[in-house]
């Protein structure tokens, strides 16, 4: 167990400021008290007035509109914001949408009806230059509302993209945020105030797409949206997950317990299930048939209630599929000794559905502590073309995996975020990529797993008040503002005081030191036996997170153990 203390280890006077400064936040006070003054006016986005005027003109002319829904949570929320907004300002608008079959992104010309006058592409489409030109030639206009990096501005589409807007300083805002800005621009032109009611969707989309929660504008939208959950589907999702979230609508709880349900439907749901979810996002008031298990008769329930039930089932289905595929992929990794490479490159043809590639790649990156590339055949792109997903390992040496791959010059494309992207490559070039990366990083320990800890505290000096204080800051945590880790040293515990708990299977290790409980999940029988093999007193070091276990109104301070090492064992001291 290795760790590195970052910051000044101030756990007495202002621990929150210590944590925030460790995350690169220069003004903790401003961060904690973020307000509307951090919002950047939409007019700083290039082409936004042009896009707003274009949509208004098409609505006035009663033209046919087509929205392509992108295949992730940010895509569904950004499309929902735009479609719901259009229905608000123009209830009779002739608007249609299309959901992707799988995890595709952007538009496909043959799926857009010939009589469409305006195509709107939220959360995608900036770099689809050929498609823009083809649609233009048949007389169709295109509005792109996007946030992804792109090399240039399209000549044949109206592109509103914060990455392509030099005067718009917030590059972290995602598709849902950009959709909201678009609606704001239309509001001002029409003297309306409809965009504000969709802030809950703005928040969900930004959190799901791992927007940098250090950015003040982005954080403001996240916070405001979670304070104002009005959307019926979102309200029921938070209600369903109340046990896990303890009723706390925080950024971290949303990322862990709400967005994975929506994502599961996008990844493993049938076309009918995805369509029902989209109708729920679009505020449908319909009733749908539902038959309870063990009953012969069906009843009609609200679409939002039924959709939440379906999402729960799909999340469980996704877990079963991912677990089974994960075993097969890990077997391949071991059989072919792939961990010897600097980057984990795995050919997964026939093992895993395309829609789950990114999810599994992310899990493998966390487990193997190195960047991961999962590849499969892609006959649609060419006979000898492989495509798939990459995921970086944020805590490792390589901070921008996408750039490293692009710099090899061997890929057809690598598109997406620095540590989460899709790619295409010629089969023979993938072998060369592996050689290039192995050579480039031959003297670097890519898997170096040194945990950055915010505080290092001897066990004898750790106070329950400090643990409860840190737990009270949980609403601040999010992407790039990670929950703090604490290194607790020289903790002495009698072996017989260590418990192994669980209802069906014992998987939790627990012990108490002073007023503080220590708990480690996913601890099987083998782990417990190894930990308790010695007699006497264990002297251990622990890396963990501060938690508070609340029961019947009483809060018990806990350390959720991330890593544990036994430093030494000593004999029991005589008590007389």
Swiss-Prot record:
Decide whether keyword Phosphoprotein is in the record: yes
InterPro entries per UniProt: DDH_dom, DHH_sf, RecJ, RecJ_OB, SSDNA_exonuclease_RecJ
What UniProt keywords are attached to this protein's entry? Answer: Exonuclease, Hydrolase, Nuclease, Phosphoprotein
Q: Does the keyword Hydrolase apply?
A: yes
GO MF annotation, one: single-stranded DNA 5'-3' DNA exonuclease activity
SUPFAM superfamilies, per the entry = DHH phosphoesterases
Enumerate the Gene Ontology biological process terms.
DNA recombination; DNA repair
Top-level taxonomic group: Bacteria
Which residues are annotated with the PTM Phosphotyrosine? 473
Q: What is its EC number?
A: 3.1.-.-
Q: Which family, according to the similarity comment?
A: Belongs to the RecJ family.
Per its UniProt record, what PANTHER family does this chain match?
Answer: SINGLE-STRANDED-DNA-SPECIFIC EXONUCLEASE RECJ (PTHR30255:SF2)
Q: What does this protein do?
A: Putative single-stranded-DNA-specific exonuclease.
Protein name (record): Putative SPbeta prophage-derived single-strand DNA-specific exonuclease YorK
Originating organism = Bacillus subtilis (strain 168)
Gene giving rise to this polypeptide: yorK
């Amino acid at each position: 167990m290795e760790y590195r203390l970052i910051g000044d280890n101030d756990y007495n006077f202002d621990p929150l400021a210590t944590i925030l400064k460790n995350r690169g936040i220069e003004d903790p006070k401003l961060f904690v008290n973020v307000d509307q003054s951090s919002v950047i006016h939409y007019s700083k986005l290039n082409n936004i007035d042009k896009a707003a005027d274009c949509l208004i003109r098409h609505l006035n002319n009663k033209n046919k509109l087509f929205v392509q829904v992108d295949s992730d949570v940010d895509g569904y929320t950004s499309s929902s914001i735009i479609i719901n907004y259009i229905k608000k300002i123009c209830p009779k608008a002739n608007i249609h949408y299309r959901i992707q079959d799988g995890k595709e992104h952007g538009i496909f010309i043959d799926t857009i009806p010939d009589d469409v006058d305006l195509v709107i592409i939220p959360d995608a489409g900036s770099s689809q230059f050929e498609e823009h030109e083809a649609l233009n030639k048949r007389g169709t206009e295109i509005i792109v509302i996007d946030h992804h990096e792109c090399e240039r501005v399209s000549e044949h589409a109206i592109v509103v993209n914060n990455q392509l807007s030099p005067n718009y300083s917030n590059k972290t805002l995602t598709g849902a945020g950009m959709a909201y800005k678009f609606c704001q621009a239309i509001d001002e032109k029409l003297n309306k105030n409809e965009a504000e009611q969709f802030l809950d969707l703005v928040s969900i989309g930004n959190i799901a797409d791992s927007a940098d929660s250090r950015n003040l504008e982005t954080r403001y939208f996240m916070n405001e949206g979670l304070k104002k959950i009005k959307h019926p589907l979102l309200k029921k999702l938070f209600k369903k997950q109340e046990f896990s979230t303890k009723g706390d609508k925080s950024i971290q709880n949303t990322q862990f317990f709400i967005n994975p349900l929506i994502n599961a439907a996008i990844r493993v749901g049938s076309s009918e299930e995805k369509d029902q979810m989209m109708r729920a996002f679009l505020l449908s008031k319909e009733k749908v048939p539902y038959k309870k298990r063990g009953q012969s008769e069906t009843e009609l329930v609200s679409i939002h209630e039924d959709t939440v039930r379906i999402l729960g089932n799909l999340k469980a289905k996704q877990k079963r599929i991912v677990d089974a595929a994960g075993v097969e992929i890990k077997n391949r990794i071991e059989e072919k000794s792939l961990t010897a490479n600097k980057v984990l490159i795995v050919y997964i043809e026939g093992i895993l559905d395309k829609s789950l590639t990114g999810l599994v790649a992310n899990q493998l990156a966390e487990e193997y502590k190195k960047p991961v590339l999962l590849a499969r055949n892609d006959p649609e792109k060419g006979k000898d073309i492989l495509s798939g997903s990459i995921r970086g390992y944020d805590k490792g040496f390589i901070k921008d995996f996408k750039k490293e791959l692009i710099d090899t010059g061997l890929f057809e494309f690598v598109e997406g975020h620095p540590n989460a992207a899709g790619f295409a490559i010629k089969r023979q070039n993938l072998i060369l990529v592996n050689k290039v990366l192995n050579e480039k990083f031959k003297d670097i320990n890519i898997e170096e797993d040194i945990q950055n800890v915010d505080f290092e505290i001897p066990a004898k000096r750790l106070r329950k008040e400090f643990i409860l204080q840190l737990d009270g800051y949980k609403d601040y945590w999010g992407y790039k503002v990670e929950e703090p880790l604490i290194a607790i040293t020289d903790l002495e515990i009698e072996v017989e005081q260590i418990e192994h708990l669980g209802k069906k299977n014992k998987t939790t290790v627990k012990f108490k030191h002073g007023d503080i409980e220590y708990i480690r999940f996913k601890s099987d029988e083998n782990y417990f036996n190894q930990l308790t093999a010695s007699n006497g007193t264990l002297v251990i070091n622990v890396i963990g997170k501060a938690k508070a276990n609340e029961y019947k109104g009483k809060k018990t301070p806990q350390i959720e153990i991330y890593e544990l090492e036994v430093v030494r064992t000593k004999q029991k001291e005589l008590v007389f």
